[in-house]
Design a protein with these regions (language model features):
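Gly/Ser/Thr-rich active-site loops/lids in small-molecule metabolic enzymes
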Residues: 159-167, 208-211, 216-237
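ATP/nucleoside-binding phosphotransfer catalytic cores, i.e., glycine-rich phosphate-binding loops
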Residues: 26, 188, 194, 219, ...
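Glycine-rich phosphate/pyrophosphate-binding beta-alpha loops
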Residues: 144, 148, 201-215, 280
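Catalytic core of DAGKc-family lipid kinases
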Residues: 14-16, 40, 47-48, 86-199
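ATP/NTP phosphate-donor binding region
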Residues: 2-71, 81, 119, 304
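Short glycine/serine/threonine-rich phosphate/pyrophosphate-binding segments
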Residues: 78-83, 103
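N-terminal glycine-rich "phosphate-gripper" loop used for MgATP/nucleotide binding
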Residues: 73-77
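A generic structural signal for short beta-strands and their flanking turns/coil linkers
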Residues: 180-182, 196-198, 221-226, 260-262
């Protein structure tokens, strides 16, 4: 134990916390994590202010004295995306999943077992992860255009604190009543002609919220993104697509387009929102590309274990 303590002594860990992530307050879990890391010999700083997190990471990237050994993203998918956008490619990241869906954490093997998390950090093992970039902003799991991006926009506009799955009901009903499913054009390097659709999903990982699998591949370390487009508008088509994705039928449908890509341009003649990892991204047009190996995470790669 003394040798282990000495090996990590003076190594700095930043806990980047989103205090409004998920359905309830998780301060007791965060306190236990911080105390456990200190007991193992680490210097620990816990911060929830986004500007302060940016400053700490910028200083850590520029000086060896303030180097960050690991950043623990304590929140949901949006929290991880924020930290990723502030971090250098070689900065090791870890996840304490405190969000509603925790899409990325589930697929990378992170859970709320703080002892397992500390063991991963202490092992010094890391693996690389591709990232997507949308108009200069990183995303880790998914970028999407259309109805669900409108739901994200509506939720973000009224969000005041912790959320759970029921929080999504009102913005979903609002979007069902008001969203007009405008046409979008999706241009990829693999097609001379644009794909005309009303929904578009761009995945860096295999699964979406609720464990839905839109694409067959979704390997987060293959240097490619997975595109899934739906051409039909209206809510009843959305219900049909949901059932199709649930049972894996949709990929053979004539009004579905699935393709692996490295760069995509999505545009529309109308104002259409897009979202990145559950946070609003803006409005079209958007240029999306893959950044191979852009991120570093602690632990063993799930690809190696599969």
């Amino acid at each position: 134990d003394n040798e282990r303590y000495e090996s990590v002594m003076n190594k700095k860990i930043l806990i980047a916390e989103n205090p409004s992530a998920g359905a309830r307050d998780k301060q007791s879990l965060l306190s236990d994590l911080k105390e456990g890391l200190i007991e193992r010999g680490y210097q620990v700083e816990q911060e929830s202010d986004q500007k302060r997190i940016q400053d700490i990471l910028a200083i850590g990237d520029s000086t060896n004295e303030e180097k960050i050994e690991c950043v623990i993203c304590a929140g949901g998918d949006g929290t991880i995306g924020f930290v990723a956008n502030c971090s250098a490619p070689a900065t090791p990241l870890a996840i304490l999943p405190l969000g509603t869906e925790n899409v990325l954490a589930k697929q990378l093997g992170f859970d709320c077992d703080i002892n397992r998390l500390m063991d991963k950090i202490e092992s010094s093992k890391t693996f690389a992860l591709d990232a997507g970039e949308a108009n200069g902003q990183l995303f880790l799991a998914v970028a999407s255009v259309g109805f669900d991006a409108e739901v994200v926009r509506l939720l973000s506009a009224r969000r005041t604190g912790h959320i759970d799955h029921t929080t999504w009901i009102r913005p979903i009903l609002q979007a069902l009543g008001g969203y007009r499913f405008p046409k979008i054009r999706v241009r990829t390097e693999g097609n001379e002609k644009a794909v005309h659709a009303r929904w578009a999903f761009v995945f860096n990982v295999p699964r979406y919220a609720l464990g839905l699998r839109f694409v067959a591949e979704g390997d987060f370390a293959d240097g490619r993104l997975d595109l899934c487009c739906f051409r039909g508008g209206r809510w009843w088509n959305g219900l049909r697509y949901f059932v199709g994705v649930l049972f894996g039928w949709h990929r053979s449908w004539r009004d579905t387009h699935v393709e692996q890509v490295t760069q995509i341009v999505i545009e529309s003649d109308e104002a259409v929102p897009y979202q990145l990892d559950g946070d609003p991204g803006g409005e079209l047009p958007v240029t999306i590309r893959v950044l191979p190996g852009r991120l570093t995470f602690v632990g063993r790669s799930p690809v190696a274990d599969s």
